[in-house]
Curated annotation (Swiss-Prot):
Residues 394-404 have a biased composition (Acidic residues). Residues 175-185 have a biased composition (Basic residues). InterPro entries: CCD48, EF_hand_dom. Keywords: Coiled coil. It comes from Homo sapiens (Human). Residues 1-22, 96-127, 175-198, 326-411 are annotated as: Disordered. The lineage of its organism: Eukaryota, Metazoa, Chordata, Craniata, Vertebrata. Signal peptide: none annotated. PROSITE patterns: EF_HAND_2 (PS50222). Residues 343-359 have a biased composition (Basic and acidic residues). Residues 54-89 form the EF-hand domain. Pfam families: CCD48. Transmembrane segments: none annotated. One of its GO terms (molecular function) is calcium ion binding. This is EF-hand and coiled-coil domain-containing protein 1.
Amino acid sequence: MEPVSTGAEAGMEGAGGDPYRRPARRTQWLLSALAHHYGLDRGVENEIVVLATGLDQYLQEVFHHLDCRGAGRLPRADFRALCAVLGLRAEGATTAGQAAGDGNSRDVTPGDAAAELATDGDSDTDEEARLALRAEPPELTFRQFHARLCGYFGTRAGPRLPRGALSEHIETQIRLRRPRRRRRPPCAPGPDSGPDCERVARLEEENSSLRELVEDLRAALQSSDARCLALQVGLWKSQASTHEMGHGGPEAAVRELRQAQGALAAAEARAGRLRRGQAEVRRRAEEARQVVLRSLHRVRELEALAQQVPGLQRWVRRLEAELQRYRSEDSQLPTPQLANPEPGDKSNEPEDAGTRDPDPTPEGAWQSDSSSGSRALDEVDEQLFRSVEGQAASDEEEVEEERWQEEKKTPAAEAKTLLARLSSCRGRCDDQTAEKLMTYFGHFGGANHAHTLGELEACIAMLVEQLRTQGCGGRTLGTSEEEAELQQKVEENEHLRLELQMVETERVRLSLLEEKLVDVLQLLQRLRDLNISKRALGKILLSTLDAFRDPTHEGRPSPAAILDALHQALAACQLLRRQPSAPASAAAALTNPLLVSC
């Protein structure tokens, strides 16, 4: 193999402008092959011997080694780095063709040199060659890669002989692989040429084997050259990036340091926000736990109150029965007996008996009091009759009667008071009033008490008339103590009614709250079975709590509203939409320690 011309090598080195040293031969093989293919180099140089499988296969191997990703596309930066390694500048006019022309200028005439200078000075051709390399897309396919390189040398080659590409390729391959040599006439077979012919045949076989070996070595050398060219491109890119970084100097280092400090500050800020968020989550979880504990404590209190409800209900029923009994006894007073003086006595007895002890029935006392009152009135009538018949009594009896009236003036006034109280009584009088009345009637049983008995008869008649007109519709209590006691019982009854109503309302509210808690626990159990992440569950809880921290909500939200919103947020989870709804038996089988049995 012959060394390449020094002029071509110097031209290539000058055109490349390579910032680092590279081997003198290996990176120029592709340029020589392209220049020879497009007629820019008139001789077969040493670099052309690597063209074992053709130019297209050579370019494909180079593209394959440059495309390290295996995507079938070459980035624009890699293509520009390849052009820089090969010495092809889109902004320059120095090419491999010029280098080859400078190397061969010593073998041409002055006229040919002038023609070549005129051709090289053609600005249109240079502009087309530069545009062939400069107008590339962001990523190049193999077809575009092949078109860019071949187009660059095709615009520089100028007019060529009218030969087809296939015939030219075949002629080049024949000239490279089997160079022309002088043919010798075959030896005529002779009687003594047997060993020579065998030796010639053996040598020809060895030559063919060596030729095949050389072809294999050429193919391997071509692949190695493509790999070396790809490594040169990578080295060029790394040194170019290092060179660009070195241009900045301390300013670039300071800028990178500031960027690193900014990134560190941003990371610390994010970490701080995350810590604050975690603290907020813990605080809200603690608040939710306290709310649940308070609700549980309240539920237990309500359970204790609910246990007292049956006793209160029995008490209320007893009071209602007692009140109903009083009303029924008032309505069952007989109308014909109102003309007798007994109703006053009857009305004086049962009230006190019912006030003192509601359990015993007052019918027996009522009958006994009525019988005693009637007997006392009969005795009074008899005494009055005897006193009327004995008008001619002695003066001594009259004096004694006057003295007795003076002594008993106060009891007579008290009897009048009792009768007046009886006339204004709206209910039955107590036993004490009835006993006092019977006592005074017993004292007035003598014949000397005619005047007082007359007053009593007049008062009783007036009382009967009032009872007839009013129909015993209204009556007052015997004493202020009894009235206060009855009023206190009425107030206690009303208070118990209100308390019972409040307990019932609270029980209903807690039952609703319990149902919502059970629904929320069921949804949480289903989400736990679906392996929901803690982050997503915490996000749902925080979003629900944040919704009630909105200033638009007036006052403090109720636990029922919070549970309702949490139930809706959990029900809207994507995991529950993907899975079928759980059967009703699963909801019934859920055990909850917060359940209240009312």
